[in-house]
């Protein structure tokens, strides 16, 4: 990912060939800040929701696309099953199966989604929301994966998949992933800033247009507001 001097995302660079060798030191990652692993989980979780909405809209699916779809589902399933165990390993500083599963999922399985799926297995709505948020200076302290995790929920609102949002909320709460602008300390963003974010998320080059339907700034703005209202009601209900 390339950013400008102000911290706004400019573009993704996709290389013609992949790494010849990748070495992973699980013990080194075990000793890293936990919030980085949580952000990595949020980013990898998007693999399923972005690949799924794109691949399901294809009239036919080649074998490599089917592999990408399978790997994307494995990302979601592994993250939902093993994240709690992995974070416990970091707290105790003791390797366990769940930690290794999460590391392999974030790096290896996640890489397979885009590796086999190419444009159909990389980004859709969630990453467009991330990209747009980077233009706001107030977001620059937030980790990439946290903004992407928020973007997943905005994408699901656009898809009108509130049932899936409800499924994810306990997981988000457990890991501390943001469920709203409020959770990211952005509740006071001005209306004109939200409008600018929505316009940026739907620029012609953005991957949100890989989703079926017409993706306009109004669609994104309304989804962000609906999500914010829903999460505010849940906070009041507590």
Q: Each predicted region: which residue ranges?
A:
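A glycine/threonine-rich phosphate-anchoring loop and its flanking beta-alpha core
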Residues: 1-68
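C-terminal charged capping/lid subdomain of soluble metabolic enzymes
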Residues: 161-238
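Active-site segments that bind and position negatively charged phosphate/pyrophosphate groups
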Residues: 61-174
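Short hydrophobic "helix-edge" motifs at membrane interfaces and signal-peptide entry regions
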Residues: 15-16, 116-118, 206-207
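A short secondary-structure junction motif
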Residues: 48, 52-56, 86, 109, ...
């Amino acid at each position: 990912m390339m950013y400008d001097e102000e911290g706004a995302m400019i573009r993704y660079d996709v290389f013609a060939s992949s790494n010849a060798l990748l070495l992973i030191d699980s013990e080194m990652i075990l000793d890293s800040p936990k919030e980085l692993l949580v952000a990595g989980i949020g980013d990898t979780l998007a693999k399923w929701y972005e690949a799924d909405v794109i691949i399901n809209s294809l009239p036919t699916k080649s074998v490599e696309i089917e592999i990408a779809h399978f790997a994307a589902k494995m990302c979601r399933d592994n993250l939902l099953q093993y994240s709690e165990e992995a974070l416990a390993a970091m707290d105790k500083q003791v390797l366990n199966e769940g930690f290794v599963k999460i590391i392999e999922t974030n790096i290896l399985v996640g890489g397979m989604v885009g590796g086999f799926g190419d444009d159909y297995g990389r980004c859709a709505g969630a990453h467009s929301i991330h990209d747009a948020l980077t233009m706001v200076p107030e977001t620059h302290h937030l980790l990439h994966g946290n903004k992407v995790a928020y973007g997943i929920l905005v994408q699901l609102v656009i898809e009108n998949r509130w049932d899936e949002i409800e499924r994810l909320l306990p997981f988000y709460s457990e890991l501390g992933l943001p469920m709203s602008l409020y959770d990211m300390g952005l509740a006071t963003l001005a209306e004109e800033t939200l409008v600018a974010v929505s316009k940026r998320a739907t620029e012609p080059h953005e991957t949100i247009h890989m989703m079926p339907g017409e993706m306009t700034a109004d669609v994104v703005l309304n989804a962000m507001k609906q999500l914010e209202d829903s999460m505010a009601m849940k906070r009041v209900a507590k």
